[in-house]
Every structure is written in structure tokens, then in C-alpha cells.
């Protein structure tokens, strides 16, 4: 530990725990028994190399202990419902507050979770529509209202005195039947007259009705002449009518009505039959007088798509329905029928499908060598959707028996639908699901709600329309709502609107103006999810809390970074301690206090290299971060490679999501950056359109591409690889060694050792996934899980293998004194040195070293790797493959979780891939990466509806000069201070 830092700590007084979080002896993961004091109520940034111990200190020590102490203070009953954190390996922590962690994990993969529900904006919207929304009739477009009996009486008494009226109970409205039994029942109850299909009759002399035709029947409850003293009688008559007609009553004018007051006309729903008198419908419920469309009581649950009371019955509130996609069933229309044109049948080895197609060919006059595109439309429809009543003769033979049958053909798509519904096999269901795609629900048009909810409007909009707006446009709309409401409604809505507007403002402040409120949470990136939770926390207004954040700037353009940092300062100014694990230069410079952890990664990290204000960090010669902040070290700009405009991949008229018929050319053999503000359309262009379209063409992938006309230039590449941040495995059994393929030669090496050969061990003996060499007590896991209910689940080291995963006999086979279990426990750096005599193993670990993953363990569970680490493991796997020089690599924000120094190493690797003739395209906001690109495509200019256009393209220098490019504005000063080697000019490159 630095002597200066120790002396500084000794000078601090005994009351420092009130002003600081004091940590003594932190040893979690790679932390080297460190002591540190973090000032309270400040914005504190933890920085350092990837794997140096930042998250171990911030999340696994400080947050874990703060959360553990809070949960421990609750009753045993409450604790069983909460996740208990293990006590971190630390001697003492003082000055802790209740801790809240805001990490990069996606909020929820549940399709019912949306931006609106996660931020609680939608909950307030439901309340707003329930309290001040006005229902409108789908038939007439007029407002429909419910009234109390008192309101009904008041409306009638407001008519001119002397007006003659009939008070009717509309018991039958447009329904077929004879109604003999009902007519007799009403007569028995004492009613005298009835109006049937527009004509009054004595009940005793009512005509016989034709049951084949619909009828309207109104029972006459009372005949009234409007006078001031009939209020009591009117109330009783209304109650009788409402009871008889299930909440409805009609007042019909016996003469032509006199003009009612203007306000009354507005409030009263009327119907006017050309051949009959004018009527006023009153309803205890909400009901349309023309169509009979009724709404139950308007309450918040009516607007919830997660509640059967409000969800669209057709799609169950999901807003989409699954349909078989014809393009997925027939991905390549150039293929012959017998060569796999019908994808679901192409993989099967069963003769059934060939025999079925042969029979169809005989019937419809085609052969198995006929290309799909050459079939007549009628034949294609019959193959896909069935032959209808047309019977076809089929002959089947399975090697045992043969038989003939004559029947209609159900069709490939019909067959997929039926099997998907009927199968109980999860595997079969997953296979069939590849041919489905989501389409907006036809019943609710994707709004998720039943018709009754969508007819309720605030102003002129129903709740579904506002959910489809971006955060920015929704904010503008909610500002105008008070103008559309009357005084009473504004009193009700005032507090609700305030809460909604505040939450929308917080989302704007963290750069999420482009998201729609209906956007599914599962489609958000880790950075977007984290910033949504950050906005929610500011909305909660808590004080005295410890917030721990993990790189909130991920996925955020430099333009929006200042607003994010203002948000963090606002959180601090509320009286909270904000600890941020961050590599962003602006965030480090803005911090009140910085901890630089290092000096290296993994076993070489875990020390406090420097601490203090940003200025003190920059003055500390030991701080690698400080050297990058001062400019002593930097990511250098390599010489640009000139584009060859004859070798490009061209996307023509991409129009998915917010893209506005974009045509983009990506030069091959270069390092290209796709840039632009968040929500500008980068992922839609690169992942949803380019990658999916090419992957379907080259790899027969099942996911459909976003709408576009065509992709040109595919002849120049032989494969496309999306190196994303999804986990390298879904189970703890998957690890870097198994994913990169290094574990197979390791097992083969151990199987080739003299001791293993003498015992007859094969490579399978050294696998922890199969019986033989693994410990059967824990089935190769090394630990046994014990559920503790109101305490955290305890993972006890297996008594039999002592956590080694293998049985004793397998562990007796040693190489250089190490067993297979010892190898799995090594870091990548240790393993590369250990296997330096085994080229196949050494080379794989060296590629992991080159992407900056020295510190991860060979057998580390895949589920414990961050998104950035998983992405770099995938990159290492690609690096270890034999290069063809014709691969297109796509990476989405590969600098996630990387320090300046790690970025430098990553860029060396990416440029090496390009040097081999490959093409690398990255979506990136990091200016240190953008400045090293050969070519840049900048999308925007804004996010959401304001984006979706190519603002600028060319070398970084051209982007810096583009007047409409936000990226260029921030890139220009970075390029000016960058060290520039001699390079070709753009004009030379063009030649």
C-alpha cells in the first residue's frame, strides 16, 4: 500500500465513519486485503483495468454487505421472500447505508413487461384514463356516459315544463325471438303497455312475433308531463325501468321536443329515428344507444393488458399473434422440391416426406427436380395450405409394409400449426417455433387491450395510442392534456399528470427520449435497462441511500452523456452516496472522488493504485488511468485503409423500425464503425436487417430480417458472424474452456498420459458432464445446493470430491503435478504457461490473453461472465479459427466494460482480423474506437422518429466536418489531439 495513502488515512479523525464508508480487510475474489475509505454523499467512480477488482469491491463487497444488513434487520418471515446475500470476505465495514444496486442486466424477458410498466408510467396512465377518460361509441363516435338516478331525474326536470314523455324500459334490442313468455311475465307484474318495433300495444293484446326476425321491445313504465313537483315519482319510475332493462332506461318525447339547454344537449346521448320520435337513453352502465355497445364500470384494471378484465381476448394482452411465416418455410425459392426447398421437411431422414411430395407431384404435374419458383401459384398454395376437398392418391412404403390411401392433403403450414398445438415434446415445439413469426393481433391492432378499453379517450386519444408514442412525444402530449379537460377533471387529474410528467422527464434526462412506452423490456439493451431503473430511482426521491451503478454510460452517445452525468449529480444532491463503476472519461473527470484499482487484472489486480480527486489521480505516476487522462498514453490512430468501392455489401431501402428507406454501403476488407445517437437506427440497420438477411441466405437462419428490398455483394463473403454479448452458455457447466474448444485437447492430453493409458482411460473419463470420471455425489458440479428458505440457499462443497468435480481415480492422473481439476481452477494466464508445450491448447489461451481475459478462470461458470467478457470469449474463439479472409464480423459495442488500456488491446485484435482480409463492422459510441476506423456510417440525426437516416459517411475526418452529425461534433477535438502517423488523404484513397 502506498505510504502516502496510509499516512493520509492515519490523519483522519475518529468521527470519519460518519463522513465516510470505511472498509477494512476486503478480500473478496482478487482483492488483496485492502483498506479504503469512501466519502459519503459524494459521486465516487471506481475505475481500472477489466478484471482488476472494481466490481468485487463495489458490488460483491460494499453493496452485498449493505443489502445483507438491511435484509437481516427484517423478520424471519419476511426474509424468506427476499434474496439473501452471502457475507463478503471482509473484516469490517462502517458507515454503510441501505444499498441499491443498478446493474446492466436486462429488466425482464417477460413479453408483458414494457417500458411503461417498468417505470410505473403506465400504472398512472391507467389511473388517468379510468378517472377522467370519456367512453365513445364505436358506432356513432359520440360520447357515452353512465348516470345515477338523481342525474337522470335532473336531466328530465331540466326540459321545458309541460313536455310530454314516455318512460320506457328497453328490454329487447335487436334480438330474434317470439317473447311470449316474457310478455306474459310483464303483464303479470302489472305493466299495461308495450312498444314493439316502433308501435305501442296493450300488453294483453300484443301481436305474435315472428321468431325469425330481430325485434325491439320497450315496456312503458310511466307517462309523464314535466313539472317541478314530479321528482319523487320520476325517481321511482327510473328505478323500475333500470331494474327491468338491466341498467337502461329511455325517455321518449310524445311530441316534438322543445329546444333543450345547450349544455344539456352536449351531455345527453340521443338517438333520432327518421320514422319516429326523439329518444334519450339513460344508462347506469356505459352504453351506446345505437349499437348497444356497453362498457362495465371504468376502473384502472380495464386498461391493464396483464389482467383478464382488460386484456384483448384474442391475443391475451400480448398484442401479437404467432403465424407460420411462408418465407421461413420456403427460405430459398431457387431450390428444387427434392433438394430441400421445403425447410421443415428438408432435415428429416424419413421417406414419408419424399413419398408425400412424389404423390403431390403426380397429382399436380411436377417433379422433385422442379424449382419452387417454377411451380404454378395454385400448386404452391395446395402444398402450403392444403388441397381442400381435392383428394390425392398417396403411396407409402417404410421397408416393412406398403399401402395406398386417398385423402385431401392438409398442407405444410397447416401441418406445422397442428403439430405445434398437439405436441407434448418440448424439443419438437422448439423446432416448429423456428417457422413462426409474430404479427400484430388483428382484433386489437397490437394495442393489447379489449375494445371496451380502447373506446375510452382522454382528449381524442385512447391509452394504446399514447403507449405507442416515444417518451419525447408522450411528454409533449401530456403537457396539452389539461387544455382538453374541464375544471373538475383537471382537479382529479392534476396529481396524476404531475407524476407522469416527472417520470417522462427523468427518462429524457438519461437519454431515452426515443423509446416508446409500449416497447417490450426484453428488447432493451443492458445500458437502456440500467438507465430506466436509474430514472425510476430518481423518481422515488429516496435520500440517505447508497447507490451502486455499473457503467451507466453504456450505449449512450456522447451528446446524451452530459445529461446522464447531471442525473447522477442530482441523485447525489438528494443526499445519497453514488458509487459508479465506470470507464467513461467524462464521468471520471466529473467525479468527486476516484478509486483506481489495479495495477493489472486478475491475480495482478486487487490493489488501490490511486485514490483522490480526478486531479490527484492524474498526478499519481502509478495510475494507468491518470496517464490516459493526461494524454501521456493514448489509443493511437492507425493508417487508414482506402475503400475499394467495387467490393462492398449494399443494403437497399432498409425500412425496419424507424429507418427511412436507408441504402447503405459497407466497404469490404475495412474496419467500419456504425455510429449515431441512441435510437438512431444502428442496431436495426446492422443486426435486424443486414445480419439477419445475410445469415438467412448463408446459414439458413430462421430469424426474419427487417423490411428491405435486397442485399447486394454477397458473392464477396462466405460467412457472417454476430459476436454479441449473450451468454456463452445457459448452464453453470459451460465455461470458457468448453466454449472455445480448449477443453477437448486438454482431456485428450490427459488421456494420453502414461498413467491414464495404463488404466485404459479415454478422453470422456475427464469430462465432468458424463458418468465415468466425474463425482457422482454432486454429478460433476463440485457443490451441493441446500435450500434454507428464509436464509440464502447454501452451496456446500461436495464432501466426496471436495469441490474437485471428479472422482478420486480420475484425479490421480497428473501432468506436471496437476490434475484436470487443478487445470480448470487456473486463470487463462496460468494455463497458457502450463500448456506451453501443447500447441493446440496454448494457442487458444493465447487468443484469450490477446483480448484481455488473462484473469478469468479456465473453468469459470459461463453464467458468472459479464456480457462484455462473454463477447470477448466469442471473439477469441473466432481468432483461433483458420482465417478465410472472406468473413464479415459484426460486433455491438465491444468496448463494454473496457478500460482505455483494454480498448487499445481490443482494437489491435480487430485490426488484425481486418489485416487477414476480413471485414469488421462495429456499433460503437466510444470515440477512441471511432477515431481508429477506416470508414464510418453515422445514423440520425436524432433518436426514434427523428432518426433513421444516414447523416454522414466516410473516413472519421469527413464525419468530423459533417454539419448535421452529432458524432462529428464530439469526434473533431479527439482527432485533433490524436497522434497521427503518416497516412493517405481521402483523395489518394479514392484513386
Curated annotation (Swiss-Prot):
Q: Please state every residue range assigned to the domain named ABC transporter.
A: 345-624, 644-972
The answer to whether keyword Repeat applies is yes
Q: How does it assemble?
A: Forms a heterotetramer with UvrB during the search for lesions.
Pfam families reported in the protein's UniProt record? ABC_tran (PF00005), UvrA_DNA-bind (PF17755), UvrA_inter (PF17760)
Q: Where are the zinc fingers (C4-type)?
A: 775-801
User: What protein family is recorded?
Assistant: Belongs to the ABC transporter superfamily. UvrA family.
Kindly list the organism's lineage.
Answer: Bacteria, Pseudomonadati, Pseudomonadota, Alphaproteobacteria, Hyphomicrobiales
Originating gene: uvrA
Q: What is this protein called?
A: UvrABC system protein A
Q: Which InterPro entries match?
A: ABC_transporter-like_ATP-bd, ABC_transporter-like_CS, P-loop_NTPase, UvrA, UvrA_DNA-bd, UvrA_inter
GO molecular function terms here?
Answer: ATP binding; ATP hydrolysis activity; DNA binding; excinuclease ABC activity; zinc ion binding
Which GO annotations describe the biological process of this protein?
Answer: nucleotide-excision repair; SOS response
* Subcellular localization, as worded in the UniProt entry: Cytoplasm
CDD domains given in the database record = ABC_UvrA_I, ABC_UvrA_II
A GO-annotated cellular component: cytoplasm
Tell me the function of this protein: The UvrABC repair system catalyzes the recognition and processing of DNA lesions. UvrA is an ATPase and a DNA-binding protein. A damage recognition complex composed of 2 UvrA and 2 UvrB subunits scans DNA for abnormalities. When the presence of a lesion has been verified by UvrB, the UvrA molecules dissociate.
Q: What is its main location?
A: cytoplasm
UniProt keyword list: ATP-binding, Cytoplasm, DNA damage, DNA excision, DNA repair, DNA-binding, Excision nuclease, Metal-binding, Nucleotide-binding, Repeat, SOS response, Zinc, Zinc-finger
Give residues annotated as binding ATP: 48-55, 676-683
Q: Which NCBIfam families match?
A: PRK00349.1, uvra
